[in-house]
Amino acid sequence: SEVSEVIYPGLFQNPRDRKRNRKYLETGNGPMVGFELKGGKQAGQKFIDNLQMVYHVANVGDVRTLAIHPASTTHSQLSAVDQEKTGVTPGYVRLCIGLEHIDDILADLTQALEKT
C-alpha cells in the first residue's frame, strides 16, 4: 500500500508548526509519527498484520517500536462518523519509535508496506 500523508510535527507542514514547536516542543518532536495508508481500514489492518518486529499494542510508553491502527482497535467502538470527528481516519496508523536500530525499524516498515 502507499502512504498518502505523514503526520509529524517536525515536518513543518504549515507555518504555525514552527511557532508551536518553538513554544511547546523546545527539545524536539518526540518518537510519535502517524501516517495514512491509501486503501483505508483494510490497508491499515493488513499493514499491522504484516509487521514482524514492530509490536502491535495500544500503549505508547515502551522502549520497543509500537504500532496501532486506531480504527480497528482503540476507536473501533465508534461509528465511522465519530471516528472522523476524533481525527481517526480509516487508513491511519500511529507509530511510536523505539530503541531498535533504525535500519531494523525501516526494514520492517518497508516489508509490511510492500505486502499491504
Which stretches of residues belong to each language-model region?
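Conserved small-domain helix->loop->beta segment predominantly found in fold-type I
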Residues: 1-63, 78-84
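PLP-dependent enzyme catalytic core of the Aspartate aminotransferase-like
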Residues: 49, 65-116
